[in-house]
Structure formats: C-alpha cells, structure tokens
C-alpha cells in the first residue's frame, strides 16, 4: 500500500492497508 507523505513531499509505502 502507498500513501502520500506531505511532511516529506513524497509517496511512502506501508504494510498497513487500513491507512488512508
């Protein structure tokens, strides 16, 4: 799962599929 990280201005990957 990937999500955008506005604090670091890039996309991040996570195992947590429940993350928005």
Swiss-Prot record:
It comes from the Eukaryota. It comes from Punica granatum. Residues 1-20 form the Barwin domain. InterPro entries: Barwin_dom. This is Punein. The N-terminus is blocked. Disulfide bonds: none annotated. GO terms for biological process: defense response to bacterium; defense response to fungus.
């Amino acid at each position: 799962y990937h999500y955008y990280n506005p604090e670091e201005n890039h996309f991040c990957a996570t195992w947590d599929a429940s993350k928005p």
